[in-house]
Each structure stands twice: as structure tokens, then as C-alpha cells.
Amino acid sequence: KYYGNGVSCNKKGCSVDWGKAIGIIGNNSAANLATGGAAGWSK
């Protein structure tokens, strides 16, 4: 199963595509800072 944030899981466990994960985390952090927390991370 792919979770859309660079993390995919199968019967063996989960793995992270750090290139995608870091890009998404960076984008969310920037959006969070710019809006005071209104955008970026889903709560």
C-alpha cells in the first residue's frame, strides 16, 4: 500500500522514499509557516 507521502508498506513492513518524503515535508512546513498553521499539515 502506498500512502502518498513517500511511505509504502507491504507484508514485510514499511519503507520510505526519502526524496518524496523530504520534498512533501518541506512543502508542508513552508505552507505551515506562511499561514501560521492553517495550511500544510492536515490535522
Curated annotation (Swiss-Prot):
Q: Where is the signal peptide?
A: none
Which GO BP terms sit in this record? defense response to bacterium; killing of cells of another organism
Record field: temperature dependence: Thermostable. Retains 100% of its maximal activity after heating at 100 degrees Celsius for 15 minutes, but only 50% of activity after heating 1 hour at this same temperature.
**InterPro entries recorded for this chain?**
Bacteriocin_IIa, Bacteriocin_IIa_CS, Bacteriocin_IIa_dom_sf
Q: What does this protein do?
A: This bacteriocin inhibits the growth of several Gram-positive bacteria, especially pathogenic L.monocytogenes and C.botulinum but has no effect on the growth of a number of yeasts and Gram-negative bacteria.
Q: Which family does it belong to?
A: Belongs to the bacteriocin class IIA/YGNGV family.
Please state what the protein is called. Answer: Bacteriocin mundticin
